[in-house]
Amino acid sequence: MIKKYAITPNVDADGWFIEVENVAPTALYTSKDAAIEKAKQVAKENSPSKLVIYDQFKNVEEEHSF
């Protein structure tokens, strides 16, 4: 089964969440790049997986499969 990861903006503060399987966020990062780097690492370690990266307006910006 493919695990789904997402990078989403934190609307209440300045930061980015890593979410797993559309449940509560697992981590908050101050920079989007740091969140993406960590999410890619975790997604690769838990292959098969999919990473969806959203912009600050919650539009899909990128998708990656591992």
Curated annotation (Swiss-Prot):
Pfam families xref list = DUF2188 (PF09954)
Q: Which InterPro entries match?
A: DUF2188
Q: What is this protein called?
A: Uncharacterized protein YycD
Q: Which organism is it from?
A: Bacillus subtilis (strain 168)
